[in-house]
Amino acid sequence: MIELGVNIDHVATLRQQRHTVYPDPVQAALRAEDAGADLITLHLREDRRHILDADVHAIRPLLRTRMNLECAITPEMLDIACAVRPSDVCLVPEKRTELTTEGGLEVAGALDAVRDAVARLHDAGIRVSLFIDPDIAQIQAAAQAGATVIELHTGAYAEAPDGQAGPELDRLRAALAEGLRHGMRVNAGHGLHYGNVAPIAALDGIAELNIGHAIVAQAVFDGWEKAVRDMKALMVQARQQALRGR
């Protein structure tokens, strides 16, 4: 069944706004697991704007599920990933001026660098995914780079005006088929929330959705565990309905 990766970055964002010790991302990770999260996702950015090195090191040994560490392809970040050895690393693009990740990794234009990073992480026993736009050329390049997992950037779908998401959903569907054709595990994420997650979760073959901001926001009103449970329930229900409708 489809898996939910709960991204805890914005728990850390709330903490860093006042440079306090709360809310604690460690507790967020553990309580998300209790509520049904299948993995915990966190992005250690070069500017350390939310998740800190100490968070990564504290969370890693405590998880009962999996850690999915998002990071840029830099010597520093690859060193940290190889030292921490999470079960999964998702390589992402990064710009210091962006509010959040703005697009997918440019794999086709930096094939050698991506291939080297993937090989190094694989040698450390880490499964590697590449966060890419739902573009056939990028998926083919990801396969050439040796990646066994891709995460499709759902931002264009999530940001489409009401009633106009259909073409973006078709694009994601085609990208999913291409990834599966290459024998890859295909995940997805970015901008997904309670009102738009169902059509993505219904795509048979999507293994995992990584969602954070929407869950953190809903937790303000409903509490953390309920926000996680409700997102997971929406995903599972959408997938089950899609399978029954075949």
From Swiss-Prot:
Site (Transition state stabilizer): 151
Pfam families (alphabetical): PdxJ
Biological pathway: Cofactor biosynthesis; pyridoxine 5'-phosphate biosynthesis; pyridoxine 5'-phosphate from D-erythrose 4-phosphate: step 5/5
Keywords, sorted A to Z: Cytoplasm, Pyridoxine biosynthesis, Transferase
GO molecular function annotations of the record: pyridoxine 5'-phosphate synthase activity
Active-site positions on this chain: 43 (proton acceptor), 70 (proton acceptor), 190 (proton donor)
InterPro entries: Aldolase_TIM, PyrdxlP_synth_PdxJ, Pyridoxine-5'_phos_synth
Binding residues annotated for 3-amino-2-oxopropyl phosphate, in chain numbering: 7, 18, 191, 212-213
Class of the enzyme per the UniProt entry, highest EC level: transferase
Compartments, as annotated in UniProt: Cytoplasm
SUPFAM superfamilies reported for this sequence: Pyridoxine 5'-phosphate synthase
Record-listed E.C. numbers: 2.6.99.2
Residues annotated as signal peptide: none
GO BP, sorted A to Z: pyridoxine biosynthetic process
Binding of 1-deoxy-D-xylulose 5-phosphate, residues: 9-10, 45, 50, 100
CC annotations in GO: cytosol
Catalytic activity: 3-amino-2-oxopropyl phosphate + 1-deoxy-D-xylulose 5-phosphate = pyridoxine 5'-phosphate + phosphate + 2 H2O + H(+)
Role summary: Catalyzes the complicated ring closure reaction between the two acyclic compounds 1-deoxy-D-xylulose-5-phosphate (DXP) and 3-amino-2-oxopropyl phosphate (1-amino-acetone-3-phosphate or AAP) to form pyridoxine 5'-phosphate (PNP) and inorganic phosphate.
Family annotation (PANTHER family): PYRIDOXINE 5'-PHOSPHATE SYNTHASE (PTHR30456:SF0)
HAMAP family: PdxJ
Subunit structure: Homooctamer; tetramer of dimers.
Protein name per the record: Pyridoxine 5'-phosphate synthase
Organism: Bordetella petrii (strain ATCC BAA-461 / DSM 12804 / CCUG 43448)
